[in-house]
Amino acid sequence: VAEMSRMAHAAGKQIICYKLGKSELGKELAKSHTGAIAGNDDAFNAFINYHGIARVEIFETLIEIPNLFKNKKRSKSKRVGIVTTTGGGGAMVVESLSGSDIEIIDSGLSIKKIMQDNNIAFNNNKLVDLTIAGTKPEIVNEVISQMMKNENCDLVVMVVGSSAKFRPEQAVEPLLKWANDPKPLAVYVAPDAPEALNLLHQNNVDKKTALEYV
């Protein structure tokens, strides 16, 4: 695996793995398979982190995650900026990421000024909640632009609420311009919004259809 990892990175390719064995029962079941990597899960995580291998927790994520790495330079840091149009959906993402070895960054004074200039309440530095008032293409563009330029942020997560289903032009279409940006942008669509998801997929923007994939 280590040699494969070195060859893949030399060729500019990312390795993504899914592994059983987080639970004691899972470890026992995994041992029965030929070629299984047995042993302590913490040791395995240390091994793949050292070799730059990304691990996913849900099998279906193997299908959704490649766009997050496509043409992106992987950072050793884990600093994430989160923007949302829906407070509930944004809080769910923050909760999900808080259980990982991830630092959710402060949004900074520039974004605070954008919010104040547009009369949008700014209550939490860790979660930029645009609310309905800020779900406008020009505001989304301005806020995400600041996040993407922030040198203290390695990845940006945008959470889009019901506007993704009924008005994708407000908060989904403005995100397409960053599809090929060196900094990864992941979009979590809170409601069922197939047209918005298809739009993101067609433009190679990393989309998440379940909270656990974020």
Predicted features and spans:
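Short, glycine-rich nucleotide/cofactor-binding loops
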Residues: 1, 54-58, 134, 162-166
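Charged helix-capping and loop-helix junction motifs
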Residues: 2-4, 169-175
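Loop/helix-junction capping segments adjacent to catalytic residues or to phosphate/diphosphate-binding pockets
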Residues: 91, 137-138, 165-169, 194
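Short glycine-cluster motifs
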Residues: 26-29, 76-161, 203
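Tubulin/FtsZ superfamily GTPase core signature
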Residues: 3-9, 48
